[in-house]
């Protein structure tokens, strides 16, 4: 049975990056600290995907899409109005594609190592992330209707928290299976 040490190490970095992102969000009120932690998390994601890409092309695709999303995010930061909304939706879709490649590639590698349970968890994580993306896009498009947008924002928050926790659990378990 083949092991995937680069994927395991890369996924560990992705897990750490997600923890750093949580800390960055909590410390976002401290402008410099939050921004630095956000950048550290972003670098860890890119390094993790690049490292994992040595074991499977799915991670390489996720890496490339992450770079494209970074560019879209920078451009989006300098635009507003309709263009900003469109770029925001594009970024949501690109994030979803990255999660798709990370989760499905990892699930497939886990199955190849005989861990069908982790593979099934990956499918569940992916479906929740897809639901989050759909709700997020709909909320973005309906942002001009405040009451509806507020309801969707609450639903989105609940689903995102569940999806994020399951994603973290998935990222934490995957390196043990793939190593």
Model-derived features: positions:
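Short hydrophobic membrane-inserting alpha-helices and related fusion/pore-forming segments
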Residues: 26-37, 76-91, 139-156
């Amino acid at each position: 049975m083949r092991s995937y040490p680069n994927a395991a190490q890369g996924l560990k970095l992705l897990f750490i990056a997600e923890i750093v992102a949580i800390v960055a969000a909590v410390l976002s009120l401290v402008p410099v600290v939050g921004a630095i932690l956000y950048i550290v998390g972003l670098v860890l994601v890119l390094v993790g995907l690049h490292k994992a890409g040595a074991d499977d092309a799915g991670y390489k695709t996720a890496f490339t899409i992450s770079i494209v999303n970074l560019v879209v995010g920078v451009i989006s930061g300098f635009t507003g109005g309709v263009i900003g909304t469109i770029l925001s939706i594009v970024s949501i879709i690109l994030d979803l594609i990255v999660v798709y490649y990370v989760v499905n590639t990892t699930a497939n590698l886990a199955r190849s190592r005989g861990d069908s349970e982790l593979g099934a968890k990956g499918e569940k994580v992916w479906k929740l992330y897809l639901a989050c993306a759909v709700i997020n896009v709909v909320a973005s498009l309906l942002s001009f209707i405040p009451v509806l947008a507020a309801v969707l924002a609450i639903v989105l928050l609940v689903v995102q928290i569940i999806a994020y926790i399951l994603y973290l659990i998935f990222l934490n378990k995957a390196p043990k299976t793939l190593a």
